[in-house]
Amino acid sequence: MSQQLSFNASSAKPDKSFSNYFWGANDEGYHALLSRFSDVKHINEELRSFYHERANIEEDYAKRMAKLSRTTFSSLETGCLKESVQVMKAEVDNMAKSHLQISQLLQDDVENAFTRYAASLKDKKKMIVSGIEKVHKDKLSKHQALVKAQDKYHYLCKKVNYYVSQQNMLFGKELEKNNAKLNKTQNAITASSSDYQSAVAAVRDSYARWTNEWRSTCDKLQDIEEERRHFLKSVMWTFTLLISRSCFNDDQACERIRKNLEQCSVSQDVLEFIDAKSTGTGIPQPPKFYDYYKGEVPDDSVELVQANFQRAQTKIENDNMPLNRPYVLSATARNESSFENTLPNTPSAIQSLTTVSSNSSQNGRSSPKKSFLSKFKLTSRPSTPNVGNTAPDALSSPRNDSPLTSAADEQMKHLSLQEEPKQNPTPAAPGAFPNSNTLPPRYNELGSLPSPNSVSFTEDSRPNVNTPSRRQQIQEEFGSVLQMENRAVSPVYDSRKNGSRSSFTLRKSRSPKRPSSSLSQNASRLPRSLTPGNLEPNYDFGVRVDPASGTAPTDDEPYTDRDSSFVDDTINTKATGNTSNRLSLPAYPTDGGDTSIDNPTSTDGQRILGYVSALYDYDAAIPEEISFRKGDTIAVLKLYEDGWWEGFVVGEDDHNRGQFPSNFVREIEV
């Protein structure tokens, strides 16, 4: 039987509720909402199983940690480190107890909550479903009786019409029989019509009752659904609070360990170890030659000489230097989601360490790498293709507005030789941070805190290039520094190879620029696992003056470091742009001597800037880096402004070169 739905066109769209949107000609809404109870039961059971397994994991973790805290280790340790080890064991035991308590709370407040809710839901279902099912069955039975009465009445009506149509076609006895049947059917149709009307009235009453009951049931079912969703939100919220409490308890335990370590003095421990375990200060001398032929007889005494050595000054700047080293994140940890983006407070241990590092820098301590860095120009990260040696006419001719030319003009303005003092940043110790309020680089890497404050400049911190002593120092120390890399021939210079060659070039690093974003999916462009401390400043060493030129550079504009590129060669004089007044850099040292000994190169001819020794082990996190072990000697080929250097391990294939953190090494003299 076809169903035709009629709506009042003037009525507005009903509100979104169960009582308005769960109807249907064949009771589709009734079946949809009642089947929801089965879905909810399945959902609750899945979540209960999940939290049950999570509580078991927490309990197993707590038991294993408690077992670990009862193990015996470092019994031979001495000094305050022995006390720190005991504190660590006690705090690990506290962590185990905390996690065991959390596992119990997960079982009581989370897992068992689903069991209690399932029992409550079962009672509600029994009460609601049983009532509406009776009404629904009564409606169905009345509707079936209506259909049966309707079919019977329809059949009798068809028979009456048939007998009436036969009256004009029959005669005699056949006509009499037809009329008798017609009278009998007419009597039956009267009773059938009465039954049919009664069935319609009964169905009308059952539909009215069904509409009221189902509307009320829809409201109750919607209340149950809303209550269920609030329950799930509450349970998941409780779960997160318990896990957060566990992490907070662990952090408090770690903070107590850190505070104990802050009180530990390595120097004092060493002195106490010497007092407790020293074996004497006498150095036994080698045995003498006894001439038995002359009657010399050795005695049993051992000749001792008092030891009075002076220990070489250590490179460690303070007793807490190992704590200043930033934690090296693994490649997996670097790519995980950064929940530390909104760190509320800096841990006290990190704050104290940054304060120590800043104080050491402010007290005049320069970086142990300063003597090494001050000899070379740091290479900034590239953002444009390499620009080779440009002919003088190209420099003096009008330029277009290309990005490369604009960058060169901008840098030439910053390096123009005018009579103004140039500012030089104060050098900072490796691993130190600009101020005590700045987190270590691993936190900056996550993007959670503002960038470090700019370092202060002093007006008289940079010596004037004009002074004769300064020019002589430049000529002696940095005569060939700017030719330290073998560059590919620039397209600009190649097209002008027959013209005069300018001594000043725009120098770019050929290494790809590392993106700061941690969302890159290219493994070779992942963010650094470690930013090696504060960026070393560009120590001012000026430019080399051509002895044939009588023009000396002046400092009129302050030097501004550029991240993308910088101009260390192409400089115009302040005067008129006359090419004859330009400074020129000799391609080779003025002494004319052989530089092959003083300037070692790699097998491919690239200049080796110096050598460093590894202080720690380091494993490469991305293909652009190299791995080395503590004590390895590394030849340095390039220096970058972000604190990463490029080189290779001496003794290995020098083609296997890559970048490494500069605060993992120290300078050595070769």
Swiss-Prot record:
CDD domains: F-BAR_PombeCdc15_like, SH3. Residues 607-670 form the SH3 domain. Keywords: Cell cycle, Cell division, Coiled coil, Cytoplasm, Cytoskeleton, Mitosis, Phosphoprotein, SH3 domain. Residues 357-377 have a biased composition (Low complexity). It is found in: Cytoplasm, Cytoskeleton. GO terms for cellular component: actomyosin contractile ring; cell division site; cytoplasm; cytoplasmic side of plasma membrane; cytosol; mitotic actomyosin contractile ring; mitotic actomyosin contractile ring, proximal layer. Residues 16-269 form the F-BAR domain. It holds the Pfam family SH3_1. Residues 353-472, 489-602 are annotated as: Disordered. One of its GO terms (molecular function) is phospholipid binding. Residues 380-389, 450-472, 570-583 have a biased composition (Polar residues). One of its GO terms (biological process) is mitotic actomyosin contractile ring assembly. Residues 410-422 have a biased composition (Basic and acidic residues). It comes from the Eukaryota. The modification Phosphothreonine is found at T531. InterPro entries: AH/BAR_dom_sf (IPR027267), F_BAR (IPR031160), FCH_dom (IPR001060), SH3-like_dom_sf (IPR036028), SH3_domain (IPR001452). The modification Phosphoserine is found at S397, S503. The keyword Ribonucleoprotein does not apply. Required for normal septation. Involved in the disassembly of the medial ring during septation. This is Septation protein imp2. It comes from Schizosaccharomyces pombe (strain 972 / ATCC 24843).
